[in-house]
Amino acid sequence: MSPKDLTIPTGADGEGSVQVHLDEADKITGAKVFAVYGKGGIGKSTTSSNLSAAFSILGKRVLQIGCDPKHDSTFTLTGSLVPTVIDVLKDVDFHPEELRPEDFVFEGFNGVMCVEAGGPPAGTGCGGYVVGQTVKLLKQHHLLDDTDVVIFDVLGDVVCGGFAAPLQHADQAVVVTANDFDSIYAMNRIIAAVQAKSKNYKVRLAGCVANRSRATDEVDRFCKETNFRRLAHMPDLDAIRRSRLKKKTLFEMDEDQDVLAARAEYIRLAESLWRGLDPIDPHSLPDRDIFELLGFD
C-alpha cells in the first residue's frame, strides 16, 4: 500500500491528516485505559505512578506504560530505570518473537506491572511506532488479559500524531497542570488535540489534576471558561519531591499529615476514575483568549 491508497479524512482531526489504522487485534479490551498528558516537567510521571499505586491499593491489577525516551515513568514504582521495549527489541535485532515477558515487564510497588516503551534516538523515527509495538508485545504475550487498569504516561505536551498514539487505546485522558500560565496554555493545546482525536477514537477527556500548586484559582478559572473540570489537587509538598529521590511512591513515605492527605486525594481520584465520570464536552480557547483570561491583570 502506498500513501496515495490511504483514505484522508477531513474535518477537525487535522486538515489532510492521515489516521493510523488500529488493527482490531491490537485493541486493549477488558481494562480501563487512561492516558496522562501535560506540560513537560509538570510531574506526569509522579502523578501517574502514585495513581497506579492508588489503583493497586484499591485491589486493581494495574499496568503502567511509560511513553518517554527518558524511560523514568515507572522509576518510583520499581526503584530503578528498567530497560525499554525499544532497547530489548534492538538486542534481538527487532525479532519480537524472541522476547520473553520478563525482558520488558517489571513488577513494582504493590504488584503494579511496569513497562517503559522508550523512544527512537533524537531526530529519528516516531514515538507512536514504539507505543504501537509495545501494545503488540503485551497482547502477543497475553499480558493484558488479567489487567484492570492501564495507564499511559505520555511524553511532555507533544500533540503530534506519534505521541497521540496512546489516544487510540485510551478511554479517557487526564491532563496534569499547575496553577500557572505556561501549564494551562499547554493544557489548552492538549484539550484541542484530544477533542480532535475523539471524533475518530473512543477517547474522551476526564479532567485535570492541579499538581505542585498551592492554589487552584487560575486552573479553576480556565475550567469554568472552557467547560473543563478539575479532578484533584496535589499541593507542592516536599515529601513528594523526596519520594522521587528515594525511588518510592507517596504510599511508601513516612506518614505525616500532609502525606496522608495527599494519599487520600490519590485514592479519591482513583475511585472516581474507576467509578466513571459524567461526560463533559470542553472546548479549547484561541491563544489570544488565553492571554486575556490568564496573562494580564
UniProtKB/Swiss-Prot annotation:
The UniProt record lists the keyword Iron: yes
S-S bonds: none
Pathways per UniProt: Porphyrin-containing compound metabolism; bacteriochlorophyll biosynthesis (light-independent)
Cofactor(s) annotated in UniProt: [4Fe-4S] cluster
Enzymatic reactions: chlorophyllide a + oxidized 2[4Fe-4S]-[ferredoxin] + 2 ADP + 2 phosphate = protochlorophyllide a + reduced 2[4Fe-4S]-[ferredoxin] + 2 ATP + 2 H2O
Sites where the protein binds Mg(2+): S45
Primary enzyme class: oxidoreductase
GO MF assignments: 4 iron, 4 sulfur cluster binding; ATP binding; metal ion binding; oxidoreductase activity, acting on iron-sulfur proteins as donors; oxidoreductase activity, acting on the CH-CH group of donors, iron-sulfur protein as acceptor
Family: Belongs to the NifH/BchL/ChlL family.
Protein name: Light-independent protochlorophyllide reductase iron-sulfur ATP-binding protein
Higher taxonomy: Bacteria, Pseudomonadati, Pseudomonadota, Alphaproteobacteria, Rhodobacterales
